[in-house]
């Protein structure tokens, strides 16, 4: 599997056993100016948000976790 990985936002091979790509987004103090923070990566299973306000989307095809567009 290959997924986009931050901070480079480049497609890279995932480690063995990690077949899920994810896009994690959340707001910080600059959300109104810069938009949501974004983390892209690989995982063995879809991660669970650690706190409220974090949105995680998962997919399982190569490079499916593209950087989200600002609305």
From Swiss-Prot:
Disulfide partners: 3-21, 14-42, 27-31, 46-58, 59-64
Annotated compartments: Secreted
Keywords annotated in UniProt: Acetylcholine receptor inhibiting toxin, Disulfide bond, Ion channel impairing toxin, Neurotoxin, Postsynaptic neurotoxin, Secreted, Toxin
Tissue-wise expression: Expressed by the venom gland.
Pfam families in the record: Toxin_cobra-type (PF21947)
GO annotations of cellular component type: extracellular region
PROSITE patterns the record matches: SNAKE_TOXIN
Entry GO MF terms: acetylcholine receptor inhibitor activity; ion channel regulator activity; toxin activity
Transmembrane segments: none
Family: Belongs to the three-finger toxin family. Long-chain subfamily. Type II alpha-neurotoxin sub-subfamily.
Function of the protein: Binds with high affinity to muscular (alpha-1/CHRNA1) and neuronal (alpha-7/CHRNA7) nicotinic acetylcholine receptor (nAChR) and inhibits acetylcholine from binding to the receptor, thereby impairing neuromuscular and neuronal transmission.
Name used for this protein in its record: Pseudonajatoxin b
Species name: Pseudonaja textilis
Taxonomic placement: Eukaryota, Metazoa, Chordata, Craniata, Vertebrata
């Amino acid at each position: 599997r290959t997924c986009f990985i931050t901070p480079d936002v480049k497609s890279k091979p995932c480690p063995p056993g990690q077949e899920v790509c994810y896009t994690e987004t959340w707001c910080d103090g600059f959300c109104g100016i810069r938009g949501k923070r974004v983390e892209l990566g690989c995982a063995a299973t879809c991660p669970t948000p650690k706190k409220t306000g974090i949105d995680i989307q998962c997919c399982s095809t190569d490079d499916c976790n593209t950087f989200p567009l600002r609305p």
